[in-house]
Amino acid sequence: MINIQNTILGKIVDRKHEELAARLKQRNLQDVEELAKAATPVRGFANALQHKRPGVIAEIKKASPSKGIIRADFNPAEIAEQYEQAGAACLSVLTDVDFFQGADENIAIARNHCALPALRKDFLVDPYNVVEARALHADCILLIVACLSDQQLEEMSKTAFEHQLDVLVEVHDEEELERALKLSEQCLLGVNNRNLKTFDVDLNTTIRLKKLLPASRLLITESGIATPDDVRMMQEHDIHSFLVGESFMKQPRPDQAFTALFGQPQTV
């Protein structure tokens, strides 16, 4: 693990451990398991992503630590509808409150207004958070290698699969990729072009790490995709899956921003 102390990521992770302790007092794991069993059926996240080209995970995000408020007029239901009409394969929904102004209920709100599967975009630190994601009606979870140990990654991905959730494992460099590749091949791999220690963006991060993967392994590029040229650059390197949020969220019509960036994705 990288040293994340004195970074934004470190502050977020510290807050997540505080949140976890508070949530465990409110509702024990057994109760959350019961809620997870009663949740709406899982929609296949990985399957949806693999059957669209380009496969776009479109993000519902109000704010971020680096940019502050990105979208003041924030309506998750309307955004989800627009993304589906534009041709998104999946949704990514921020649930972190303190740093991204997200909310747990936004997953259900978004899913109730479209047929797309949804990723719970948050900084999960314990298997409890994984079960909680299913209870919130998520179809996929995010595991960020930079803030989890190998044991946590293994345990949390296993818990996810036991609850029929897909898993997106996020890496930023070669060392993190090496750790991610120890996990089940069932896991989706995402490369964050944003350095979570400095928040600088470099699109070449995805291209560099793609070369270390078998050609058959699907890779998702995350952060910094802002122009059609950015999309073409990725496609020229056989990268066809994208997670995009800010580029859509800062435009008045996210669906029009989607089309301007990706055109009309095709079902494959």
UniProtKB/Swiss-Prot annotation:
User: A single Pfam family, by name?
Assistant: IGPS
Q: Which reaction does it catalyse?
A: 1-(2-carboxyphenylamino)-1-deoxy-D-ribulose 5-phosphate + H(+) = (1S,2R)-1-C-(indol-3-yl)glycerol 3-phosphate + CO2 + H2O
- Report if keyword Lyase is assigned: yes
The yes or no answer to whether the keyword Amino-acid biosynthesis is present is yes
The protein's UniProt keywords, in alphabetical order, are: Amino-acid biosynthesis, Aromatic amino acid biosynthesis, Decarboxylase, Lyase, Tryptophan biosynthesis
Annotated GO MF terms: indole-3-glycerol-phosphate synthase activity; phosphoribosylanthranilate isomerase activity
What domain of life is recorded for the organism?
Bacteria
Q: Which GO BP terms sit in this record?
A: L-tryptophan biosynthetic process
Tell me which Gene3D superfamilies the record gives.
Aldolase class I
Q: In which pathway does it act?
A: Amino-acid biosynthesis; L-tryptophan biosynthesis; L-tryptophan from chorismate: step 4/5
Which InterPro entries does the record cross-reference, listed alphabetically?
A: Aldolase_TIM, Indole-3-glycerol_P_synth, Indole-3-glycerol_P_synth_dom, Indole-3-GlycerolPSynthase_CS, RibuloseP-bd_barrel
Q: Which E.C. number(s) belong to this protein?
A: 4.1.1.48
Q: What class of enzyme is it?
A: lyase
- PANTHER family in alphabetical order: INDOLE-3-GLYCEROL-PHOSPHATE SYNTHASE, TRYPTOPHAN BIOSYNTHESIS PROTEIN
Q: Which family does it belong to?
A: Belongs to the TrpC family.
Give the protein's recorded name.
Answer: Indole-3-glycerol phosphate synthase
